[in-house]
């Protein structure tokens, strides 16, 4: 009986650890006040990036930034646009009073490394893309698509 309970606890801890690795994308709302997460009709995570500054740089800060096999879309479009991963997506509400970004910086402020295991797509205007994580970035089966519509 005692051994079964220990095994049960060990299995629970293993799954708990796996869940923590799959946190996905978690904005750091203390820094990125307008960064918004959504999903497309087919379930692909959609990030409405922050409006760019006067130099065209959209700086987005996350506690966690992980991309699973479904991929992730970074919405850099003011208008309705078509994406490879998610089909038709609406315009980014953060860009309605500004231009689209020419550079997108995704910075991780949390303590975990990023796991990039799927496609990342910039939908809308083409932009340079920078992912910064001082804890490291694990890449497996990743790609970056930059579409201009």
Set out the residue ranges of the language-model regions.
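Solvent-exposed adhesion/ligand-recognition segments of exported proteins
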Residues: 21-149
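Bacterial N-terminal signal peptides that target proteins for export
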Residues: 1-9
């Amino acid at each position: 009986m005692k051994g079964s309970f220990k095994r049960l606890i060990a299995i629970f801890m293993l799954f708990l650890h796996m869940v923590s690795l799959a946190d996905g994308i978690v904005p750091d709302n203390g820094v990125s006040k307008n960064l918004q997460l959504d999903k497309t009709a087919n379930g692909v995570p959609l990030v409405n990036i922050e409006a760019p500054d006067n130099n065209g740089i959209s700086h987005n800060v996350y506690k966690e930034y992980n991309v699973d096999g479904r991929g992730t879309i970074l919405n850099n479009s003011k208008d309705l646009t078509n994406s490879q991963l998610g089909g038709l997506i609406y315009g980014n509400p953060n860009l309605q009073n500004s231009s689209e970004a020419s550079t997108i910086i995704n910075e991780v402020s949390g303590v975990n490394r990023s796991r990039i295991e799927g496609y990342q797509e910039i939908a809308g205007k083409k932009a340079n893309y920078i992912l910064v994580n001082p804890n490291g970035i694990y890449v497996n089966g990743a790609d970056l698509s930059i579409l201009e519509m």
